[in-house]
Amino acid sequence: MAKNMAIGIDLGTTYSCVGVFQHGKVEIIANDQGNRTTPSYVAFTDTERLIGDAAKNQVALNPQNTVFDAKRLIGRKFGDPVVQSDMKHWPFRVINDGDKPKVQVSYKGETKAFYPEEISSMVLTKMKEIAEAYLGHPVTNAVITVPAYFNDSQRQATKDAGVIAGLNVLRIINEPTAAAIAYGLDRTGKGERNVLIFDLGGGTFDVSILTIDDGIFEVKATAGDTHLGGEDFDNRLVNHFVEEFKRKHKKDISQNKRAVRRLRTACERAKRTLSSSTQASLEIDSLFEGIDFYTSITRARFEELCSDLFRSTLEPVEKALRDAKLDKAQIHDLVLVGGSTRIPKVQKLLQDFFNGRDLNKSINPDEAVAYGAAVQAAILMGDKSENVQDLLLLDVAPLSLGLETAGGVMTALIKRNSTIPTKQTQIFTTYSDNQPGVLIQVYEGERAMTRDNNLLGRFELSGIPPAPRGVPQIEVTFDIDANGILNVTATDKSTGKANKITITNDKGRLSKEEIERMVQEAEKYKAEDEVQRERVSAKNALESYAFNMKSAVEDEGLKGKISEADKKKVLDKCQEVISWLDANTLAEKDEFEHKRKELEQVCNPIISRLYQGAGGPGAGGFGAQGPKGGSGSGPTIEEVD
């Protein structure tokens, strides 16, 4: 069965994405860079052909021979006004071959010309290989998506590209239809439904209105702007910072291609950050003539820079409604597609236009189309699993998420492979007396010690009222939403003071390979980790016992119940152990255990005499596990069991 699996491919203008339906759910497949979307770029050099990330990464060095936007050419005539106007903006050459456009490049020292279908087929081949690498066997069957407004020749040309790539194209389906399938809107079974798909991608903006009745999809209207997308928002940011650089440093970087390219990459990253944070910082070393460019931008400023572009997205929505002869109150579902729909302002404008209606956005917007294509592919291959009949979307956290407790121990709140969205809360406390604050350091990874894991971010919770160690209660909450965005909040229960950090699933975090490597390494290191964990645990137990004994015999309530000689004996021994601990933080587990036995031999007889005399507070009740003590600079947190 597994061998004749079918994949779903979203062949995008700027990015493509591939998914497969297996084990009862859709899996969006990451490429060798760990990215779940792959640039629709093909580059030709003196020595090789590059596709995807590798092609996009070298575009600044090789602009004439790096081809993108093939989707704007496919199935069109050379004389088409669209082709003529687009040609003005491309760094690569487009030539006329019998009124068919061809892209001319230099490859291995020769001049070559390729049809758009050939360029698209190279991207499709890449997507096919990404799926094969993941599934571990050859894949031939595929469903490929196209915009709803594609005409027959554009559809046929896309199918041809699939054939050139060695695919058996089961069906070409509309992108908005795929998105609606992804959300299972064809299975609500409530009679006819009108669905508006708002698709704002990297280079294009499409609005489609579909009517779904009993599993039948009908496109009622399409509208949009073939030249509006994420790249335009990047351009606004680039222009803004070019001007800022002029003001700050009296230099114009706009003619330096490499500087502008580096600035653009930083702007794209800042734009993504601003979807989940209200501010983003850019740090570009030696951007131009050795000048470092460090700056920041707020979400409000970004929204202002792009306000006319954002507002212009509503015009096609109104046009599509008019064409479909529908009133906005007659739309049942609103679906967001395309990475740019993550921008909060875009969501708000659409939501306000529809009088506060909820938006369907639980599936990653860049992945919704490939997701639906994968479901359609499974159906066409005759997949009978009931999940295809009623599909439920469940994403998972790929790595454990937690924080550092005393001694550098990784304390996981969200275990790997937990389904998201999810929320976990745990109580921690202070590690030293009168500690004024705690440093919350958030890590991801599978190792026992945080130094072997990946630091995602840190923040401090200060203003904790003075109290003995172990008394304050700090509630830490890890909350991941459906987009994989993590919010960590720490609250001091006594004062209600809180602080938080938001960590977005920036694709630059860890690739699938790194996750695999971490998991495999974790197996290998498990034994070492276990030894280390036991060592820290033994150290903490000893330290805890020594401090507890010390405070027990110093307790005012014991005055007169314990002889000064006994008290001195306990205090001296405790002090000796505490000093030894400071000098031997890296001792082995059995040394810590041996020291603890020594200390117990001194303390136990005295404590038991005390009990026979009075039944005072027992030191044993302090829990051998004790606080997760340890070295390390700055305020630390420990876990309360």
From Swiss-Prot:
Region Nucleotide-binding domain (NBD), residue ranges: 2-386
Residues bearing PTM Phosphothreonine: 636
Keywords: Acetylation, ATP-binding, Chaperone, Cytoplasm, Cytoskeleton, Methylation, Nucleotide-binding, Nucleus, Phosphoprotein, Stress response
Residue numbers bearing the N-acetylalanine modification: 2
Extent of Gly residues compositional bias: 617-633
Positions annotated to bind ATP: 12-15, 71, 202-204, 268-275, 339-342
GO biological process, any: chaperone cofactor-dependent protein refolding
Annotated region described as Substrate-binding domain (SBD), given as residue ranges: 394-509
Residues modified to Omega-N-methylarginine: 469
PTM annotation, UniProt: In response to cellular stress, acetylated at Lys-77 by NA110 and then gradually deacetylated by HDAC4 at later stages. Acetylation enhances its chaperone activity and also determines whether it will function as a chaperone for protein refolding or degradation by controlling its binding to co-chaperones HOPX and STUB1. The acetylated form and the non-acetylated form bind to HOPX and STUB1 respectively. Acetylation also protects cells against various types of cellular stress.
Written domain comment of the UniProt record: The N-terminal nucleotide binding domain (NBD) (also known as the ATPase domain) is responsible for binding and hydrolyzing ATP. The C-terminal substrate-binding domain (SBD) (also known as peptide-binding domain) binds to the client/substrate proteins. The two domains are allosterically coupled so that, when ATP is bound to the NBD, the SBD binds relatively weakly to clients. When ADP is bound in the NBD, a conformational change enhances the affinity of the SBD for client proteins.
Family: Belongs to the heat shock protein 70 family.
UniProt-listed NCBIfam families: PRK00290.1
Role summary: Molecular chaperone implicated in a wide variety of cellular processes, including protection of the proteome from stress, folding and transport of newly synthesized polypeptides, activation of proteolysis of misfolded proteins and the formation and dissociation of protein complexes. Plays a pivotal role in the protein quality control system, ensuring the correct folding of proteins, the re-folding of misfolded proteins and controlling the targeting of proteins for subsequent degradation. This is achieved through cycles of ATP binding, ATP hydrolysis and ADP release, mediated by co-chaperones.
Protein name, per record: Heat shock 70 kDa protein 1A
